[in-house]
Amino acid sequence: MSLYGTMRTGVSGMNAQSNRLSTVAENIANANTTGYKRASTEFSSMILPSGNGSYNSGGVQTEVRYSISQQGATTFTTSASDLAIDGGGFFIVEGANGQEYLTRAGSFVPDSEGNLVNASGFTLMGYEYEAGVDPTVVVNGFDGLTRVNLASDGLIAAGSTKGSMGANLPSGAPVGDVSTTSLVVYDSQGNTRILDFNYEKTGANAWTLEIVDRASGDALTVPPVTLAFNAAGELTTSPATVVANGALIVPPPATGAVVGSITIDFSKTTQLGYAFNADGGSIDGNAPSKVAGYQIDSDGIVYVKYENGKLDPRYRIALANVQSPDKLRPESGNVYSQGVDSGVIITGFAGSGDFGEILSGALESSNVDIAEELTAMIESQRNYTANSKVFQTGSELLEVLVNLKR
C-alpha cells in the first residue's frame, strides 16, 4: 500500500465532498428562486491497477447533474403576466446579447418599452398572431420569433370587415312584401353607422336582399342579392355571402371616416310558415376604447383587453423542448442553452405535442427540498471529516516512516 496513495485518496474524498457541499449551498441559496432546478453531485469510483500482493487505493470523482425535467410546485399570483408551464417545455427568452435561451422562470412584467421581461432581465419571445391563423413555426430554430410587447395603444378603433345576418322570411307573404331589419357597423374611426337589410319577395320561394346605408340612403348591394329557397324553406343561394362595398358607395362623413368593404354571411336565412324574424346579426369592429389590461390563455395566446370587453389577439407565446432536458447547459440568470448531449431544440406551442399548458397568474417554484439539502449537508460534513482523518492517518504513518532512520 502506498502511503502517498492513501493521502491522495483522502484528498480526493475531501474534494468530492467539497463539491457536494457547493451544490447543496447553491440549492439552499436558490430555494426561493422562481423556476430554479436543483443541482446534485453524483459520485463514481476511480480504480488504479494493483500488483501482486499490493493494493493501490484509487479515489472518487464527481459530476454535477441538474434535475431540470423535474417540475416544481405551482404557486398562484394576482398578475396575469406571471406564467408557469404545467407540463413539458420551456419559455424562449432573449438576453441582452440578442441570444435566445430557455427558461422555466416566468415572472414576467412589462418594461419601459412594454416588452415582457423576467426578474433576470430576459425578454419573452413569441410569434405575432392574428385571430384564427396559427403562425408558421420553424420547429428546429428561433427564426420568426419576436419580443412579446404589451405597450398600450391608448384609444383604438377598428372598422367593421365581416358580419352575419340571419332571418326567417314568411313563406306566405305576398309578392312585393318588404321586411326590414338593421345592423350597427363601425367606420374606420369607430363611429357607428346603421345598415338596413331590406328583404322583398319577388316570387315563389324567391326574395331579394338589399343592404342600404341609412344615413345616405345609398344601396351597398348593386344589384340586390337574389335569395332562392327549396321546398323545405332552406336557402339554396350559393355562396351565401355578399360584400357590402361601403368604401365605394357610402359618401364619407366630414371626418373623412369611411365604412370599408364588409362581407355579410346570410347562410342562416330561411323561408318558413312563420312571421318575419331576424336573429340579431353580428359584426366585428369596435368603437374607440381604452386598453384595460391583457389576458393570456392556456394556449399561450396573448390578448390586449379593452374597456368595452373586446379582446385583441397580438402574440402567441412559443415554447421549446429537447429530448434530454437534464443535459441542457445552465447559464447565469436561471436560463439554459443547448448542451452537447441535450438533443436538438424543438419549437412549438402550448397544448400541442409534448408541450404543457401555460398557466397565467402562476409561477413555478424551485424543486429544492430544504430538508433533503440539510440532510445532505450534514452527510457531506461528516464524510469530509472522515476523509480528512484518512489524510491525517497517512500523514502520521509517513512521519513514523521518516523517524525510522533516527
From Swiss-Prot:
Gene3D superfamilies: Flagellar hook protein FlgE. InterPro entries: Falgellar_hook_FlgE_sf, Flag_bb_rod_N, Flagellar_basal_body_rod_CS, Flagellar_FlgE/F/G, Flg_bb/hook_C_dom, FlgE/F/G-like, FlgE_D2, LlgE_F_G-like_D1. GO terms for cellular component: bacterial-type flagellum basal body; bacterial-type flagellum hook; cytosol. Keywords: Bacterial flagellum. Its main location: other. The keyword Transferase does not apply. It is found in: Bacterial flagellum basal body. GO terms for biological process: bacterial-type flagellum-dependent swarming motility. SUPFAM superfamilies: Flagellar hook protein flgE (SSF117143). NCBIfam families: FlgEFG_subfam. Belongs to the flagella basal body rod proteins family. This is Flagellar hook protein FlgE. It comes from Rhizobium meliloti (strain 1021) (Ensifer meliloti).
